[in-house]
A protein has these predicted regions:
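Feature recognizes metal-dependent phosphohydrolase scaffolds
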Residues: 2-283
Length: 283
């Protein structure tokens, strides 16, 4: 998730290189490019321009915020109107919705790693079911299993005794799924790992490794809605030592809120060490 946070998008390019650079990096952006952030139009414009220029180097996955109803509620429509005026803002907003309907719901990396925005829901669908979907895909035509790809969440590993599929607080159509569902889904589809996004966790490090190392949560927007969370990026590389092996390296994007607080604490500690700490008067 980027959620209109331009600084985090530019930080990714600074740290890993641009898609057209000599290092040959391919980027997968896992949905929720817009809503809530301060630079939604800039982020969307950059991503779409890169996709047009380098279609094999930039992949855009549809998230639950690539949706008209969500955009009308959580800020993208307002951003279009306030930045572009009513006439051009409305036109840009409508064109963006048409683009979203053509975005894929997932991508497959090296035939072993599935990247999707939300989750697997009941996990009874297959990769072939995904391949058979025709675009454009309107929300009104979405079956529950499709809807859950953008909306469902995993059950935390610490919640012992929970197996299978359960109702989600997100809504009637949405499910939560336990580790056994992930395990069976991966086995049925020949997968080693599912990478998903969708959830920001307050004060988190930006990623979670779950469900017996078969599920990875990645959330890239730092300090999302003031949560003080780190962001994270997953770097996938072929192993030079082992054939058909992919290394997954996780890079944390440090929360600026945390960094400032830690700097303040270090500064105060240094003052105390030098005898320059704040003194209080006792009465």
């Amino acid at each position: 998730d980027i959620h209109g946070q331009l600084r985090d998008l530019l930080l990714l390019f600074k740290g890993f290189g641009c898609p057209d650079s000599a290092n040959g990096v391919t980027f997968v952006f896992n949905g929720d490019f817009i809503d809530r952030g301060c630079h939604q139009l800039e982020v969307l414009g950059i991503l779409l321009a890169l996709k047009v220029m380098m279609p094999d180097k930039v992949w855009l996955i549809r998230g639950n915020h690539e949706d008209r109803a969500m955009n009308e509620k959580y800020g993208f429509k307002l951003a279009c109107f306030s930045r572009l005026g009513h006439k051009f803002g409305e036109r840009f907003f409508d064109v963006a919705q048409q683009v979203f309907e053509y975005l894929p719901l997932a991508c497959l990396v090296s035939n072993r790693i599935l990247v999707l925005h939300g989750g697997i829901g009941k996990g009874t669908w297959t990769l072939d079911d995904l391949r058979k979907l025709s675009l454009p895909l309107k929300e009104s035509a979405m079956q529950p299993w499709i809807y859950n790809i953008m909306w469902s969440d995993p059950i935390e590993d610490g919640e012992e005794g929970l197996f299978g599929v359960h109702e989600s607080p997100r809504g009637v159509q949405t499910s939560t799924f336990a580790w056994d569902v992930t395990k069976m889904f991966c086995a049925r589809n020949g997968l080693s790992l599912v990478i998903r996004s969708h959830q920001s966790k307050m004060d988190s490090r930006g990623f979670d490794i779950m469900h017996e190392h078969m599920l990875l949560r990645i959330f890239s927007a730092r300090d999302y809605e003031g949560h003080g969370n780190d962001g994270a990026v997953a770097l996938l590389q072929d192993s030079p030592k082992e054939e058909n092996m992919i290394k997954v390296r996780l890079q944390v994007l440090r929360s600026t809120t945390k960094a400032r607080e830690e700097a303040r604490i270090r500064d105060e500690a240094a003052k105390l060490k030098d005898g320059k700490g704040v003194t209080s008067k006792l009465h």
